[in-house]
Amino acid sequence: MFIGIAGIIGAGKTTLAQQLADYLGYESFNEPVDDNPYLADFYGDMNRWGAMMQLHLLFRRFEQHQRIVWNKEKGAVQDRTIYEDTIFARMLHEAGFIDKRDYETYVGHFNVMKRFLVYPDVLIYLRVTPEVSMQRIKERGRDAEGGITLDYMEKLHQGYE
């Protein structure tokens, strides 16, 4: 069984994914945040790092997705699925942070990868307001997330809805 947890930043995905994995005896696959070499740079300058950040996350999540698919003996709970990456990329493109050429490159990579993807058996969407999300981001205190704005979260929320 493959369970995906979806939602904007600060929705509670990691917490729920870990709790479900522990309860069900599944493996938890968390969003690759701590070892992301682009995260702090991205929130500091989205125009400069938007495309590279999204490509990096797309490749990392594809790698994670393949590990989930090939390990069918044990169930998996994934904190943010690869499909959600397209929401971020589209939102960044529409906001002008990723230019047309880079966005089309991203979409091309995703379309090639899509042939090798499977949908989660269950997808849980955690809906929170951008204001609640911002409060949670502030409370967890990740330095790299200090540049996140309410406007960014509102656009992201619209992309999910």
Where are these regions (language model features)?
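Conserved lysine of the Walker
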Residues: 13
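Hydrophobic anchor at the beta1->P-loop junction of P-loop NTPases
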Residues: 5
